[in-house]
Amino acid sequence: MQCPSCQNTDSRVLESRSADAGKCVRRRRECLNCDFRFTTYERVETIPVTVIKRSNAKEIFCRSKLLNGLTRACEKTSINNQKIEAIVDEIETHLQQSNLKEISSVDLGEMILLHLKSVNEVAYIRFASVYRQFNGIEDFIDTLESFKPSNKFAAIS
């Protein structure tokens, strides 16, 4: 590992520990040339997942883009940043564990909606309105109907 101070490649590891819930290793190092101490993180290299957009354009999955979209949908709700990060982590983990090389933006959006539906209805509606490109009040009403409990005896007087 190259020293950030003198660029020497000889260093020794002073301490190693698991970090980021076991997803990486944090190492404290010391340069053998200048005694500068620095921290490195070792992570498993993952194969990037390509998102196929509605226009058939392709782009690499971007965690920050997903995080920003969820944060906007969850503004002024009871969902805190830790929960948003946890949702993004779950989706990212699912993508890596499924060994998908590509995923459609439609499938990705449905995964997000599935998480939001069980967490917060307002965030779900906000995200769905953008993701599903609502054109009017009917789209909102149809989506809101999915939250009503299906009770076949409710209509009987």
UniProtKB/Swiss-Prot annotation:
Residues of the ATP-cone domain: 49-139
Biological process terms in GO annotation: negative regulation of DNA-templated transcription
Cofactor: binding comment: Binds 1 zinc ion.
Cofactor list: Zn(2+)
Zinc finger (unnamed): 3-34
Superkingdom per UniProt: Bacteria
Alphabetic keyword roster: ATP-binding, DNA-binding, Metal-binding, Nucleotide-binding, Repressor, Transcription, Transcription regulation, Zinc, Zinc-finger
Cleavable signal peptide: none
GO molecular function annotation: ATP binding; DNA binding; zinc ion binding
A Pfam family reported for this protein in Swiss-Prot or TrEMBL: ATP-cone
Cited function: Negatively regulates transcription of bacterial ribonucleotide reductase nrd genes and operons by binding to NrdR-boxes.
Alphabetical list of PANTHER family matching this protein: TRANSCRIPTIONAL REPRESSOR NRDR
Family statement: Belongs to the NrdR family.
Full protein name: Transcriptional repressor NrdR
This protein's encoding gene: nrdR
